Amino acid sequence: MNSHHFLVGLTGGIGSGKSAAADRLAELGAAVIDTDLIAHALTAPGGAAIEPIRAAFGDAVITVDGALDRKAMRDLAFSDPQARRQLEAIIHPAIRAESDRQIREARGPYAVLVVPLLIESNAYRDRYDRICVVDCPVDVQIARVMTRSHLPEDQVRAIIAVQSSREEKLAAADDVIDNSGDLASLYAQVDRLHARYLAAARATG
């Protein structure tokens, strides 16, 4: 738990709709910090993780403009568990440090840290006052990701397979947003949670 902010950990599998939930919370005034955006900045040209990644994996995973070649790195990480662990050992501490900095500087009644692999990373668990999982059936996840990313079904299933199961996420959740319906249904649930988080933040603040 962070001493300065009431902190919500927001997570969900790929295609669950956690970005839509996070965007709504930001609209309502929460300070939203997205670890995916932090990871992109770290692996953009000149990003702090580029040289350690180059040292570990060579130029094959760096684009000509000096960014991480996401496809090459994803293919390597999926085919080689050791490579995935090596990449995580570079990226995760850097994400943790930058997210901590952004939480400290956050403006808003409470902070939301969006972490795709929150449940998988037990080291994070003691940070949060509440863990919120955005949930939907796996077949809905697959259809959304195939539509959005134009990936074949087997590749989407492979991504889902390395994430924690739906059951594991739900077991770890303090709060669950059911995103199997439309955006209006998602927003209604997010709005209710926002009111609860506001009240809890005021009570602890």
Swiss-Prot record:
Any single GO CC term annotated in Swiss-Prot or TrEMBL for this entry: cytoplasm
Q: Which locations, inside or outside the cell, does it occupy?
A: Cytoplasm
Query: Per its UniProt record, what PROSITE patterns does this chain match?
Result: DPCK (PS51219)
The entry's ATP-binding residues are G15, S16, G17, K18, S19, A20
Determine the domain of life of the protein's source: Bacteria
Q: What is the lineage of its organism?
A: Bacteria, Pseudomonadati, Pseudomonadota, Betaproteobacteria, Rhodocyclales
Keywords carried by this UniProt record: ATP-binding, Coenzyme A biosynthesis, Cytoplasm, Kinase, Nucleotide-binding, Transferase
* Its EC number(s): 2.7.1.24
**Family membership noted in the UniProt record:** Belongs to the CoaE family.
What name does the UniProt record give this protein?
Answer: Dephospho-CoA kinase
First-level EC class:
transferase
What GO molecular function terms would the record report? ATP binding; dephospho-CoA kinase activity
Q: Which HAMAP family match?
A: Dephospho_CoA_kinase
